[in-house]
Amino acid sequence: MATTNCLLALAIAGLVLVSLPGLSRGDVDARRGRELAGGCNPSGTLRPSRSHSCQDCCKAGRSYPTYACSPATTGSTKAVMTLNDFEAGGDGGDPSECDGKFHKNTERVVALSTGWYANGRRCNKNIRINANGRSVLAKVVDECDSLHGCDKEHAYQPPCRPNVVDASQAVWDALRITGEDVGEYDITWSDA
């Protein structure tokens, strides 16, 4: 009886892994992007032909979803805040789209996923970010490109997920998010 139950459990686990291949690959980022995409479906995929040496860089042969949209905005839009280095030589890649400049990480600045960036309509405008029981204003200076990536312009990083507010260290500091929580953090945001 115990052997039958064990075999049944293994069969069910195998069925789940076959039905949901992302689970067997440990594809956490892809699952998280789908979970928070809010009706925004991938518009395509990028499959780089070569890998790069940084930890977060694209890997050859791996597929990365691209998005032309972001979830609809509300008075309290759910998003994932990520950490970005807006300075020259940082992981942000090229200068900011809105003003063609690099920014100090002591400035409260953000890049928004392609759909929220809205072809630059939010450039140089403030958004309000709420997290960790705090609220902060940050200026939109760049696009976190959800359509392109894995190239020099994008610091060899994958395309942005459709639900990202990519924030400078100053934003994280103002929200008093520190230690192991820095990197990715669930937030809400709105136009200010």
From Swiss-Prot:
It comes from the Eukaryota. Residues 1-26 form the signal peptide. It is found in: Secreted. GO terms for cellular component: extracellular region. CDD domains: DPBB_kiwellin-like (cd22270). It holds the Pfam family KWL1. Coiled coil: none annotated. InterPro entries: Kiwellin-like, RlpA-like_sf. Its main location: secreted. SUPFAM superfamilies: Barwin-like endoglucanases (SSF50685). Keywords: Secreted, Signal. Belongs to the kiwellin family. This is Putative ripening-related protein 2.
